[in-house]
UniProtKB/Swiss-Prot annotation:
Keywords of the record: NADP, Oxidoreductase, Porphyrin biosynthesis
Species: Herminiimonas arsenicoxydans
Example GO BP: protoporphyrinogen IX biosynthetic process from glutamate
Active site: 57
EC number(s) given by UniProt: 1.2.1.70
Any one GO molecular function term: NADP binding
Protein name (record): Glutamyl-tRNA reductase
Gene3D superfamilies: Glutamyl-tRNA reductase, N-terminal domain, NAD(P)-binding Rossmann-like Domain
Catalytic activity: (S)-4-amino-5-oxopentanoate + tRNA(Glu) + NADP(+) = L-glutamyl-tRNA(Glu) + NADPH + H(+)
Keyword Disulfide bond listed: no
Comment field (misc): During catalysis, the active site Cys acts as a nucleophile attacking the alpha-carbonyl group of tRNA-bound glutamate with the formation of a thioester intermediate between enzyme and glutamate, and the concomitant release of tRNA(Glu). The thioester intermediate is finally reduced by direct hydride transfer from NADPH, to form the product GSA.
Residues the entry annotates as binding substrate: 56-59, 119, 124-126, 130
Family: Belongs to the glutamyl-tRNA reductase family.
Class of enzymatic activity (EC top level): oxidoreductase
Length: 429
């Protein structure tokens, strides 16, 4: 069985590329189905048996399993062509940024990702939920088989073990906390600022929690669905507005945090230019936590706008890394043990067909001898004599194959079989 993880993440590709290959959450199932069709129609049919796609703001990865052999470079090429075709991008733009991890390295990578060891925010918990969602969608799309299903179940168990037995998530600085710290570099006190959150998902909820603790002058949630926005805003004594109202109200806000699932930018250059003019060039602090990005990159060039992306926040979230190094070492040790256990399971799975054949062959021998014994009993033969014949017949049939193989073998092959057979049959020799 061939296992593989192919993708790009925040360490190999800039956000400008990651946003182009991100899959919206509601399209993951369709993407998995498309990936399996894509690999299946290739000449080698490499990695077409099982597939799952993980897509977050920091990574897009495809996990695959196949009985067909295939090289790492071939797998990278196939994945690059698939991503390029699916997202309508040039192949040459993607290929240099992709990595491929085969076999135990793929398993180790999945375990590390789910445990938060491969995240921009070391130990952050959101990635585990995102991976579980990705696996559910892959399963619904028919992408999971025996191997990926088992790998991901063990992945989730390892992540739980790491978080329960180490302090990997302790003292970490989250994206939400980093956003607050950055804003405090621009404004002396957040208590005098109006804060706007665009979106109503988990990341916005985390950010709102951190900013609300600073007692801002006002807190507003802008969302496509007003009811959902109002529900979140009520928790923080804020108010909600529709996204459609954003162009007219943007000028009222000093701090803007955006994280939606939109495939296109929500805030454009013209909108912000008009807002800055209405604010009489009072500074505006903006954080775009979305991938694809919610805020057009050109906005960052405006003199009175301080725009940060998820990559810009990377330096802040490394705070406390040295203090957590011991936890990282502990987590890596747990992961390594579980990787070896899973690879042993895969090796054991390789002999399952052989064991099944042995059972089927033995069952056929048993049925033949049993039928013969029944016929003898029906004729009135002595029961002890029939049982004796039955046992001898079964013994002869079971030993016929090994004896024939040993007699037909020559040289080193005979020596090898002669040493192996006593182990298989547990004889005294």
């Amino acid at each position: 069985m061939q296992l593989l993880a192919v993708g790009l993440n925040h360490t190999t590709a800039p956000v400008s590329l990651r946003e182009k290959v991100a899959f919206p959450a509601d399209q993951l199932g369709q993407a998995v189905a498309s990936a399996r069709v894509w690999y299946g129609r290739s000449d080698s049919k490499t990695y077409s048996d099982e597939a799952a796609i993980l897509s977050t703001c920091n990574r897009t990865e495809l996990y695959a399993a196949s009985h067909q052999p295939g090289g790492v470079n071939e797998a990278i090429d196939l994945t690059a062509h698939f991503l390029a075709d699916y997202h309508k991008l040039p192949y040459s733009e993607l290929r240099p940024y992709l990595y491929a991890l085969p076999q135990d390295n793929a398993v180790r990578h999945a375990f590390r990702v789910a445990s938060g060891l491969d995240s921009m925010v070391l130990g952050e918990p959101q990635i585990l939920g995102q991976m579980k969602d990705a696996v559910r969608q892959a399963e619904a799309a028919g992408g999971l088989g025996t191997y990926l299903h088992q790998m991901f179940q063990r992945t989730f168990a390892v992540a739980k073990e790491v978080r329960s037995n180490t302090e990997i998530g302790a003292h970490s600085v989250s994206m939400a906390a980093a956003s607050v710290r950055l804003s405090q570099r621009i404004f002396d006190t957040i208590s005098e600022q109006n804060v706007l959150f665009i979106g109503a998902g988990e990341m916005i909820e985390l950010c709102a929690t951190h900013f609300a603790a600073q007692n801002p002058k006002s807190l507003t949630i802008a969302n496509r669905t007003l009811e959902r926005g109002e529900t979140l805003a009520h928790r923080f004594n804020g108010r909600a507005i529709r996204l459609a109202d954003l162009p007219d109200q943007l000028a009222s806000y000093d701090i803007v945090i955006s994280s939606t699932a939109s495939s296109l930018p929500i805030i454009g250059l013209g909108m912000v230019e008009r807002a800055i003019k209405a604010r009489r060039h009072k500074p505006m602090f903006m954080v775009d936590l979305a991938v694809p990005r919610d805020i057009e990159t050109e906005i960052g060039r405006l003199d009175d706008v301080f725009l940060y992306t998820v990559d810009d926040l990377g330096t802040f979230v490394q705070t406390g890394l040295e203090n957590r190094q011991a936890a990282v070492t502990q987590a890596e040790a747990i992961i390594e043990t579980r990787v070896q256990s899973f690879m042993h399971w895969i090796d054991a799975r390789a002999v399952v067909p052989v064991i099944q054949d042995l059972h089927e062959s033995s069952e056929m021998m048993r049925m033949i001898e049993l039928e013969r014994a029944r016929k003898l009993l029906a004729k009135g033969e002595d029961i002890d004599a029939v049982l004796e014949a039955l046992s001898k017949g079964l013994t002869a049939k079971f030993l016929h194959g090994p004896q024939q193989a040993l007699n037909n073998a020559q040289g080193d092959e005979r020596t090898r079989l002669a040493a192996l057979l006593p182990q298989l049959f547990r004889t005294k020799r």
